[in-house]
Amino acid sequence: MLSNLLKSIFGSRNDRLIKQYLKIVRTINELEAAISPLSDEELRAKTSEFKQRVANGEKLDQLLPEAFAVVREAGKRVLGMRHFDVQLIGGMVLHEGKIAEMRTGEGKTLMATLPTYLNALSGKGVHIVTVNDYLAKRDAEWMGQIYRFLGLTVGVVLSQMPHEEKQAAYAADITYGTNNEYGFDYLRDNMVGHSAERVQRVLNFAIVDEVDSILIDEARTPLIISGMAEGDTEIYKRIDTLIPGLTRQEDEKSPGDYSVDEKTQQVLLSEEGFEHAEKLLSEAGLLSAGSSLYDPMNVSLIHHLNAALRARALYNRDQHYVVQNGEVIIVDEFTGRLMPGRRWSEGLHQAVEAKENVPIQKENQTLASITFQNYFRMYEKLAGMTGTADTEAFEFQQIYGLETVVIPTHRPMTREDRMDQVFRTPQEKYQAIIADIKDCYERKQPVLVGTTSIENNELLAALLTKEKLPHQVLNAKQHAREADIIAQAGQPKMVTIATNMAGRGTDIVLGGNPEQEINRIRADETLDEAAKSKKIEEIHQAWQARHDEVIKLGGLHIIGTERHESRRIDNQLRGRAGRQGDPGSSRFYLSLEDPLLRIFSSDRVANIMTRLKMPEGEAIEHPWVTRAIENAQRKVEARNFDIRKQLLEYDDVANDQRKVIYQQRNELLDAEQGVSETISAIRESVVHQLIDRYIPEQSIEEQWDIPGLEKALASEFHLQIPLQKWLEEDSELHEENLHDRIIELVDTSYLNKVEQVGAPIMHQYERMIMLHSIDTHWREHLAALDHLRQGIHLRGYAQQNPKQEYKREAFELFTSMLDAIKADVTKILMTVQIRSEQQVESVAETSALRNLEYHHDTHSELAEEQPPVAENRENKQQPFVRKNEKVGRNDPCPCGSGKKYKQCHGKLN
């Protein structure tokens, strides 16, 4: 109450920020009179002037009014589009590293040109992040006209792009690309064998379009690069045939072998289920007589059994995936698009393939991984824009340190958002939806119907066909026609049924979009200019008539067939109507059997319906119901936030270790004088550790195991050292000088090898072996971390803190990995016999990674929503190195041990 009173007196923080920005807007508007008379050359010359001023030490903030005025003028000349004052405000918000919430149709794409141009003047590069390749390419071509006119270079990063083109795109002043591609390029840059193969520069400034989709919806799904693992795929088919023999528990009291938890997307075997499963596995010859599923050697069987149960109980065809050309293709739950080449991990995809009786592909091994949360936090400055961020403002602030600023609309919003109608059954709900669509169709009002799955999408399409109502269907199966369908969704009498993919990034223009028709006329070589102008004018007049007609009818009508888990996604659907002050309306139709209500709120709403004595077939439309639904959504949003926060806390451990490994790797790649000094330090450390194993510190000679040490030196380093003879001949030989003599002999042996082979060849080989060893052990370490994380929650039963235990054990694993790398490198270099340079090149070829797959995967114990996916691409890995976060020798080690870097993981240097 007090906060509301203070707001009414002083205004909210958002209001105060807008007032501050408006002062700068006035300055920009005053500059327009001086900028407008400039010639094109003079306007372009402003870029060189600004760059020089930045080089001389002037801050970007000081340049902002002039730079924005120049971009506004360029927009007028090149695109015929002048930035509104609200777009100038949005540009300032983005430049300050905040999130700009701007309503649909208010011009976010044009707004982004302002801070992009300003920050590109520093010469460090700006990354514009979009949700798909189509938008990246479209915006680079469209808005790129402004940047090129002003003398800046523009690049676009696409998924199948050749290596050289990708390097050129990242070298440009401004780069467009998708969130996935930026992340995968970063990982690939840290897997290359030569520094020249990297593609990314320093991560300077990123503007994330649809920031809620990328930083919230996809935050639970890490980017993973993997390769094929060995293994027999036949087991998936054999296990799948056993699943129908297990019965599902309908509730806690009823008998059954397994239960399904829809909230956490998990399948749990009961004790009876374990016994029944063991019997079925024994009969199938998969479990040896007398052994149990609990035996260590049968852990993989539990893994396969769980994957098969999840595939049968939780994953449905045409909802979570489709089957095309003998392949299981995942459907993106956020966009409704098909994701060819992507795969669920942990054997789930193979289990679904077995269920659908299509060819089964092998499982994958993780080679590199990072979450969007940790990738985007590496940028020196991060900003975002979307139409719906305010509901997630707390999370943006907590996780990314990003403040959300709501930008005022250019024109007042006139869309009418009607109250939800709730029915008892889906049948009643769909009858009401059909009646609403029919009413709009008869009045010629365009309708966009939003569905949450392909299954519901096609069900509604079938009902409309039965009613003989013409309509367009937009889902993952028709994604090729997406632009055409969305472009015409605002036509009179047009009925469009769409999944979540409903054209984010594409405006629905009332009366239809005439641009396609106009472009066709312009490309027609049989018409002269006069004829083209006449036809284009006729098209404009026809569009204006349709536009006016649709406005009179009330604009675009939005129908939601069920509520999403997040209020934000509902708002995105509503936001398709009412752009730039246009009229429009929206309504959601729900039933008590919809997933959100069934899982979270059905009892409460059913009680309300009973209390109000609602007859069957009647809808309830009441503030109580709306409140109950919003509470259910808040519950889900809070749960999802906790999951994302928990994922980040666990991933931060791996992230600190990742930084150390990638820094070591990049120092190896960039070392101009070779890595001989590093190799020498590692060799000395390994030899000391080996000697300490047989001659413990502060021990007496009787405790020494000299024969064991002689044998170890022979097997590890191929060195025959007569230690026993030394001791017999020299009574003065003690522990310390024995260490020194052994190390001296090891060094001499190695230097002799370098002389025989030649220093240049040996230095090249040293670098390759170091990189190969780091990469191999890092992959194994990632698998170990994943295995550790899967079972760490069980520590809670032993009164231990799982997160603390995870940090402690992950650190121990990391230390062991570093020791293993050192031992591995030393042993190989001491024992290898190099006869030619071709041998070295063959090692490089063997080390090159091929047939990589690119995943978007959830960690198993956190997989409470859409799980694991992977994308298969055939292009060579290519890639970035972040140098500006280099750890100083006396700084605390990033691994969290509390030691100085030079005394911990810096020893590798």
Swiss-Prot record:
Similarity-based family: Belongs to the SecA family.
Stretches for region Disordered: 857-909
Record keywords: ATP-binding, Cell inner membrane, Cell membrane, Cytoplasm, Membrane, Metal-binding, Nucleotide-binding, Protein transport, Translocase, Translocation, Transport, Zinc
EC number, UniProt record: 7.4.2.8
Obligatory cofactor(s): Zn(2+)
GO molecular function, one term: metal ion binding
Lineage: Bacteria, Pseudomonadati, Pseudomonadota, Betaproteobacteria, Nitrosomonadales
Pfam families for this protein: P-loop_SecA (PF21090), SEC-C (PF02810), SecA_DEAD (PF07517), SecA_PP_bind (PF01043), SecA_SW (PF07516)
SMART domains to which the protein is assigned, alphabetical: SecA_DEAD (SM00957), SecA_PP_bind (SM00958)
Basic and acidic residues bias (residue ranges): 871-889
Subunit structure: Monomer and homodimer. Part of the essential Sec protein translocation apparatus which comprises SecA, SecYEG and auxiliary proteins SecDF-YajC and YidC.
Protein name, as recorded: Protein translocase subunit SecA
